[in-house]
């Protein structure tokens, strides 16, 4: 991935009136943190959003919250730790039946795992993290590519991390998964070069989320930007304003900012 231009236009992006009209966009990990902030902003700006999460209760609460704010969203309950091929295909069939296409897909769902030396990293946990953070995005993308191809302007966005570009001690499976996600995005960029599907990566940097608190329990959340404040680059990439932008990594904070 090529780093995005240094100007801040995409950091401060505010959607124009028609940027999301008629666009159907799926957000994974939509019930909390950055996923929730992006999903909410998309609905409020006119997109039809497919809300993904693993908790039916959390999805229903989010659906009720967002329903009055814009086009009616839909929910896609799928546990990425346990889902098998048939469940992914069923979800794909439901999206195709309801919408006929997909204009955007944000891969945001992830789990942290442990911050632990490789020597002591639990093998089962390692496998879980790679399954949710890397394998699941691959499977979901593979299943949904035909629906993305049905769009005149489709956007595929991956949420990455600074440790996906340069590994650091104790970040273990999470760092390895994010590095794999960066490579998956690069591979897709090349493979989809002559299609309407554009692929980009966003590294939001440290953000006020539950995952960040788990990673840095002694850190003051007030010192970090809110999920809402880092949402604009995601909106920029998922909407029509970024048509033609592909193969870029957008570091919301400075590239050297710890994840």
PLM features: what roles do these ranges have?
Residues 141, 177:
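Active-site helix of classical SDR
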Residues 68-84:
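Rossmann-fold cofactor-recognition segment
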Residues 161:
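Residue(s) in the substrate-gating loop at a strand-loop-helix junction
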Residues 31-32:
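Conserved glycine-rich cofactor-binding loop
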Residues 91, 116-118, 122-127:
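Substrate-binding pocket helix/loop in short-chain dehydrogenase/reductase
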Residues 4-10, 194-197, 201-202, 209, ...:
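C-terminal helical subdomain
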Residues 146, 189-191:
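Alpha-helical segment proximal to the catalytic Tyr-Lys
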């Amino acid at each position: 991935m090529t780093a995005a231009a240094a100007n801040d236009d995409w950091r401060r992006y505010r959607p124009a009136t028609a940027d999301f009209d008629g666009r159907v966009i799926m957000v994974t990990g939509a019930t909390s943190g950055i996923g929730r902030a992006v999903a909410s902003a998309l609905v409020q700006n006119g997109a039809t959003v497919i809300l993904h999460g693993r908790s039916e209760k959390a999805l229903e609460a989010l659906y009720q919250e967002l329903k009055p704010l814009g086009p009616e969203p839909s929910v896609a309950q799928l546990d990425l730790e346990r889902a098998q091929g048939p469940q992914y295909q069923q979800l794909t069939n439901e999206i195709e039946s309801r919408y006929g296409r997909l204009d955007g897909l944000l891969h945001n769902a992830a789990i942290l795992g442990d911050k632990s030396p490789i020597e002591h990293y639990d093998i089962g946990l390692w496998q879980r993290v790679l399954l949710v953070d890397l394998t699941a995005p691959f499977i979901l993308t593979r299943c949904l590519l035909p629906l993305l191809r049905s769009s005149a302007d489709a956007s595929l966005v991956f949420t990455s991390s600074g440790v996906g570009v340069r590994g650091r001690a104790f970040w273990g499976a999470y760092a390895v998964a994010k590095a794999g996600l960066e490579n998956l995005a690069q591979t897709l960029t090349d493979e989809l070069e002559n299609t309407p599907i554009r692929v980009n990566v966003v590294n939001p940097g440290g953000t006020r989320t539950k995952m960040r608190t788990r990673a840095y329990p002694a850190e003051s959340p007030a010192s970090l930007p809110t999920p809402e404040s880092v949402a604009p680059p995601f909106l920029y990439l998922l909407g029509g304003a970024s048509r033609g932008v592909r193969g870029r990594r957008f570091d919301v904070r400075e590239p050297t900012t710890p994840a």
